[in-house]
Amino acid sequence: MSFVITFTSVIEIPAPSFDLAMSLDSGQVFHWQKTGKGFAGTIGDFAVYIEQNGNVLKVRDGGAPARSPRRPLPEIVARYFALDHPLAEICASFPGDAVMNTSRKFCRGLRIIRQPKWECLATFICSSMKQVAHIRQISLALRRRFGDQRRVGDQVVYTFPRAQRIARASEDDLRKCALGYRARNLLMTARLVSSGKANLEAWSALPDADLREKLCALPGVGAKIANCVMLFAYERLRAFPIDVWIERTLKQQYFPRKKKVTTLQLREFSETYFGEHGGYAQQYLFHHARTALRKSAAARDSSPAHRSARNDKGRDTRVASRKSRNRKRFLDSESACSPGHCGPFEVRGPE
């Protein structure tokens, strides 16, 4: 279904202590598209284009279909980006160790985005064993295939499909969105949500432990995904998702002398050490580690020594290919795996 909508005006929203680009690129949401100086995307059913100019967000409203209940646009945007969170107080509650301080300074202005519950749950079910770029591809594919089209100026965006729409799809249809085995989990969960057996809105009243238990009972949801949904959709700011980046960061930075640290030990440590805003601390640690690794890899690839090494390797490869192509392929495959270094963190990429 397509809705063609044009801009009506630009609305300015105060946004102190907020970094729009960093928040959208921190692994919380995956559908926003960089367009010009800003980003085009959807907040629920609403299509918007957002630019940041200092402490002000300039928002152009692409609108929503008439059937959608309409709240004032500034309220919609401010709530979505959690502009009401007392960020200075939250950061002041973090532990004062060097690792956390470095991440806090690096992530200044990053806020936990308040996401629609079904959209967040479904997206993170799709995220299992996937890197951020792949999650984005899946999210956009689901939106294009099953969502509603909007236009924000000249930019086409799509809403996230409702649970009822996914529930009517076939597993094969979902697999066409590169979901793989996750297609069945998403389909089964969508059917539970659309039937009312899993009432995501009603679960808002549950205490943390009960909410986590309810989420973990859904197909495709384990402790990590449950904590992501609790943090990003239910605003449980103590929730501390532990993925491969966080696990390695915790082990290397907080348990450097222990040869073996179990997942249970990491969970217990994170719950007590990072406190009532542990979810924010986790997001800062995650984004810092992931971003620093990318910058480190880019710097290494662009360095004169690395470029020279690549040129030398190319000459050596041409010589080797004349001797033995099979031998060359084997050596190339062996040389492709090297650990990355990311400033204060020493973190290897996903294996």
PLM regions with names:
Residues 1-303, 307-318, 322-337, 349:
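HhH-family (HhH-GPD) DNA N-glycosylase catalytic core used in base-excision repair
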Residues 309, 343-344:
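Secreted/processed peptides and extracellular or luminal domains of membrane proteins
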Residues 344-350:
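Short, intrinsically disordered C-terminal tails of secreted or membrane-associated proteins
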